[in-house]
């Protein structure tokens, strides 16, 4: 069963990700949610998960004897016109003696329950780990040191610095990303510069759709806080936040397209992969303080080196060529498209809006059967869906073996 020995393969995310921050609490709260994020089936009616290793998520707070529990199926639905629509199941992990099946002993047969245990676990014991209160604690990222679920399932990489006010869109950890095949797959999937930028832009768009909404007041605060702490809100131009683009001095990055689109321009996300963190700026830079009549000026000089062996080296060079001192220019592939013949004809006296061809009305699709569309979501289903923070397949930027490592967005 799932409690067998590891086969040598692993579904664990890339080992370059260093896990810091809080660990799962040792004692549970009054909530009844899983401490960990879910694994999700890729298709409807998928069989129950099988694990290459023990199937128990990593938790350094627990002894080996306590590393046992169960995965429980959670049916999922999303609202649709006239009712709800089923989506692939999610499976949540609970320690033995906790969660919705707290009354079961390890190994008891029940539909929608898969028991798992690490080697050396005392499956006769019951856990005091408790469950999670979603109002107080975020889901803890899944990590499997000895192998994850089979290829019918996926889970999303959650960075530990994710706040409660927003949701992260990051790399999906799935069976296809196993360690032995990672090096080969990186090279095959590195893609062209156009694909890289398109995927980067898609990440930003998805993050805006699924994340918490930014109010006008919040956007204004983001754009007008202390200059060195500003970020560009959605819908803002670069020069609205950081001033006009220039040449040969501070503020010289960004062409006209980037200035107009702001963070929607995928090149912004691509280049942020090379920008140092605040700690790197402070401790890895040459810092030069200088007293001026208006105050203290801090000059921070930092150099990021992108190896010529980096799969994205040419792409970064191209973006720099376009955007450094790029004011007044646009990418060659961003020339305005000529208007169609029908729309470019000069207006005449005989022209009238009434003569324009009306778009054909879409035929109404027949209503789905009762087994596909049911009533509105129940309160229990809404609660269950509330902890499903990643319903859609994430959009992944494959940076390859970049100079700074993987998954740095």
Curated annotation (Swiss-Prot):
Residues recorded with modification Phosphoserine: 190, 192, 379
Region (Dimerization): 226-333
Keywords from the named record: ADP-ribosylation, Disulfide bond, Host Golgi apparatus, Phosphoprotein, Ribonucleoprotein, RNA-binding, Transcription, Transcription regulation, Viral nucleoprotein, Virion
Modified residues (Phosphothreonine): 378
Modification comment: ADP-ribosylated. The ADP-ribosylation is retained in the virion during infection.
PROSITE patterns: COV_N_CTD (PS51929), COV_N_NTD (PS51928)
SUPFAM superfamilies per record: Coronavirus RNA-binding domain, Nucleocapsid protein dimerization domain
Pfam families the record matches: CoV_nucleocap (PF00937)
Stretches for region RNA-binding: 29-160
Assigned GO CC terms: host cell endoplasmic reticulum-Golgi intermediate compartment; host cell Golgi apparatus; ribonucleoprotein complex; viral nucleocapsid
Residues in CoV N CTD domain copies: 215-331
Occurrences of domain CoV N NTD (ranges): 31-156
Residue ranges, compositional bias (Low complexity): 15-31, 164-179, 341-358
Coiled-coil region list: none
Region (Disordered): 1-32, 44-69, 121-145, 164-195, 238-259, 326-409
InterPro entries: N_prot_C_CoV, N_prot_N_CoV, NCAP_gCoV, Nucleocap_CoV, Nucleocapsid_C, Nucleocapsid_N
Gene Ontology terms for molecular function: RNA binding
Protein family: Belongs to the gammacoronavirus nucleocapsid protein family.
Assembly behavior: Homooligomer. Both monomeric and oligomeric forms interact with RNA. Interacts with protein M. Interacts with NSP3; this interaction serves to tether the genome to the newly translated replicase-transcriptase complex at a very early stage of infection.
Protein's job: Packages the positive strand viral genome RNA into a helical ribonucleocapsid (RNP) and plays a fundamental role during virion assembly through its interactions with the viral genome and membrane protein M. Plays an important role in enhancing the efficiency of subgenomic viral RNA transcription as well as viral replication.
Name of this chain's protein: Nucleoprotein
Organism listed in the record: Avian infectious bronchitis virus (strain DE072)
Gene of this entry: N
